[in-house]
Amino acid sequence: MTMRSATHSGPLHWFMCCALLLSSGLHAATKEWRFRVYLDEREIGYHHFSLIENGSETRMTTRAELEVTVLRIPVFSYMHENTERWSNGCLESIASVTDENGDLYRVDGDAAAGGFRVTTNDGEFVLPDCISTFAYWDREFLQHKALLNSQTGEYVDVEIDYIGERLLSAGEKTLSAHQYRLEGEDLELELWYSQEGHWLALQSSLEGGRLLRYEIEQ
């Protein structure tokens, strides 16, 4: 079974107003997004995001675990962990590890003089300054024309369109949300944000017409 990640932070390349948890300390604020992940109508795992903001500095950590079974036999497994540091809206560093059906991927990168240096399974290369990953949690990432895939280290050209204001079901609630469509090579997904700009939901089209969905934990 082949799945293309909505996470692009993964297949989750990949992939909240009502469930955004916000706590403030003396110097830092922490936000969390906790999603259940569904393949069509079947729950297959989770993807959690934790953000710590301290002035202009931001640290984001994510973890995803997915498993697809047929007759209780695992046919697909996925684990993704990623830590990113940001400063003034620019990616400063990334360190990720992914196990997709036993295939291991590592991505490490740091901002440096002349660009952003990335090391992946395929080697080392330099990207432009002030790049972004598929940072769904920050709607500003939609301004970029290319995004770093945190699973593979690929720098992916994307096309992003604003669809409009739509009603979104979130658990037992119906919310007014802004919908966007993001497309790239082997990638098609939709994102929803609240009126205040908080990330609410994600849906990704997979091979064979199946849908991968992120549903916020209530």
Each predicted region: which residue ranges?
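Residue-level detector of intrinsically disordered, flexible termini
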Residues: S5-A6, C18, H27-A28
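Acidic, serine/threonine-rich low-complexity disordered tracts
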Residues: A28-A113, V118-D122, L127-Q218
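Bacterial N-terminal signal peptides that target proteins for export
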Residues: T2-F15
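Bacterial N-terminal signal peptides
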Residues: H13-S23
